[in-house]
């Protein structure tokens, strides 16, 4: 569940920091290391692929809400990733694309009126219909990415010392 205390500015700040932080954390890793999963964990490439799928799904929700959509159909990022080639892509190329897509999302978010973040939609397709706003999805995405940044940091540290 999302951190309910993050403000719009904090959400934007955290979303803006994700791609540069991944770049920083993985700078010393080789292409082989980026694809090397640790025990029972994903590789850095797997985490990036997952973050891209989540950003596709939740970023789309945010933009749709801000643009006034009355309803959304829920999409599970774990299902969405199966329709992509994200896991097979070169890490550096994929991260560069993620950074460009994030910049495009941030452009929309920065131009949105504060009230647009609180517009609600009905989300169907995941059980009982839910009422959600753009801030909910922004908080969810920011918190989710933060957890995976910690995962990448731990992974990179272990790989650099091995």
For each feature predicted by the language model, list its residue ranges.
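A short small-residue
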Residues: 1-2, 78-86, 126-127
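Active-site rim elements
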Residues: 7-11, 90-95, 136-138
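Acidic/histidine-rich alpha-helical segments that form the ligand environment
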Residues: 18, 81-119
